[in-house]
């Protein structure tokens, strides 16, 4: 969900300042996402930074999105309430993590940034894992926009959330590929996504 940063009744007098395209993720630091049990090495690979409070607790994640190898947007997500906002735009970016991988035997698609990093760790940190940008409702659009990227892989594994929306989106996304290429991964009962599995270890 998006949060509304504006308030009050004088909306007609508000001045809208366009968000500048960031040159870099200019807040936070590379560290383990301790709230999600994701290692510093994985966070660093994906370019994810954290903001900490005075007690050293992770309070915000910063997820970078690239157009090719140029940073176009950063998603800021609060740990406590899970609200987020985006600096820049990811309308014409690749999927989360897409810039890190180029072809291979397997690529796994998941439904969120933390699930992407978690699946990467669960798979031994050696297989490509990317995340859609707009959740289950935007999965088909996101994957369609990156079909050229997926053509470079032999197998596409779809591992969306283990809920109704995720399962429905998995079927729709699988239909974008020839039947022998796309496979839907069903997570064990009790796990919504890869991060649940990582945290249970």
Where are these regions (language model features)?
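Phosphate-handling DNA/RNA-contact segment within nucleic-acid enzymes
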Residues: 54-154, 170
């Amino acid at each position: 969900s998006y949060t509304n940063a504006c308030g009050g009744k004088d909306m007609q007098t508000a001045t809208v300042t366009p968000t500048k395209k960031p040159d870099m993720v200019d807040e936070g630091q590379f560290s383990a996402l301790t709230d999600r049990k994701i290692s510093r090495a994985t966070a660093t690979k994906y370019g994810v930074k954290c903001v900490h409070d005075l007690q050293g607790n992770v309070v915000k994640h910063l997820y970078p999105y690239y157009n090719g190898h140029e940073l176009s947007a950063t998603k800021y997500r609060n740990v406590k309430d899970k609200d987020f906002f985006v600096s820049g735009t990811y309308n014409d970016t690749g999927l989360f993590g897409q810039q890190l991988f180029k072809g291979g035997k397997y690529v796994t698609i998941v439904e969120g940034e933390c699930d992407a990093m978690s699946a990467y760790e669960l798979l031994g940190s050696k297989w490509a894992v990317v995340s859609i940008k707009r959740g289950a409702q935007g999965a088909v659009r996101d994957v369609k926009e990156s079909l050229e990227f997926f053509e470079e892989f032999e197998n596409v594994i779809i591992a969306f959330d283990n809920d109704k929306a995720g399962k429905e989106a998995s079927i729709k996304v699988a239909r974008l590929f020839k039947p022998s290429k796309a496979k839907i991964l069903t997570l064990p009962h009790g796990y919504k996504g890869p991060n649940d599995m990582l945290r249970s270890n």
